[in-house]
């Protein structure tokens, strides 16, 4: 059995380590908290813990997604709720964008071979629980990339030919 003084010293050392650990963990937790509007780069807008940026320089879907990946955890935007869709619609309309379509991260890598539109997914691998098609995509159209359409107020999705050059929205960590 250890002497009482050794147990007391070890108890204080353990307590000191635990206190230091809680301070360090608290600092990490603060960094992971949802971002404030000021932490997004100029020209982008915050929503939740992400920054969103509309780029008016047109690119095809693949090049647009690659451009978005240059940002922290960035991809073409995934639209995961009606509230996020409304935020995006407002952002795009207030930008003065004059195009009919804007690229989002939706695509069908199966090229329509998966039945019942089952091949559609987000480029960042987010789960597709929210569905908001303007018109159901056709497996035979050759259009396998997703856009937001002006006709729907930039609220609903429409399939388009992936090589079209369009403006695009990136979603990335603040």
UniProtKB/Swiss-Prot annotation:
> Where is it expressed, tissue-wise?
Predominantly expressed in the small intestine, including Paneth cells (at protein level). Hardly detectable in the colon (at protein level). Highly expressed in the lung epithelium during methicillin-resistant S.aureus infection and allergic airway inflammation (at protein level). Skin injury increases its epidermal expression. Also expressed in the pancreas. Expressed by nocireceptors.
CDD domains documented for this protein: CLECT_REG-1_like (cd03594)
Q: How is it modified after translation?
A: Proteolytic processing by trypsin removes an inhibitory N-terminal propeptide and is essential for peptidoglycan binding and antibacterial activity.
Domain of life (superkingdom):
Eukaryota
The UniProt entry, under SUPFAM superfamilies, shows: C-type lectin-like
The written remark on domains in the entry is:
The EPN motif is essential for recognition of the peptidoglycan carbohydrate backbone and for efficient bacterial killing with Glu-114 playing a key role in peptidoglycan binding and bactericidal activity.
Full protein name: Regenerating islet-derived protein 3-gamma
Annotated source species? Mus musculus (Mouse)
């Amino acid at each position: 059995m250890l002497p009482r003084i050794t147990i007391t010293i070890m108890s204080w050392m353990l307590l000191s380590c635990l206190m230091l650990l809680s301070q360090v963990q608290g600092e990490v937790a603060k960094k992971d908290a949802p971002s404030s509007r000021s932490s997004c780069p100029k020209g982008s807008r915050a929503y939740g813990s992400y920054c969103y940026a509309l780029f008016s320089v047109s690119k095809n879907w693949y090049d647009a997604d690659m451009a978005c990946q240059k940002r922290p955890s960035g991809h073409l935007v995934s639209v995961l709720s009606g509230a996020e869709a409304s935020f995006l619609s407002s952002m795009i309309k207030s930008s003065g964008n004059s195009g009919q379509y804007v690229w989002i991260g939706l695509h069908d890598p199966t090229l329509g071979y998966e039945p019942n539109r089952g091949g559609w997914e987000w480029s960042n691998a987010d789960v597709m629980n929210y569905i908001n098609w303007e018109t159901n995509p056709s497996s035979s159209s050759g259009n396998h990339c997703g856009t937001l359409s002006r006709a729907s107020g930039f609220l609903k999705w429409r399939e388009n030919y992936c090589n079209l050059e369009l403006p695009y929205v990136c979603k990335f960590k603040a």
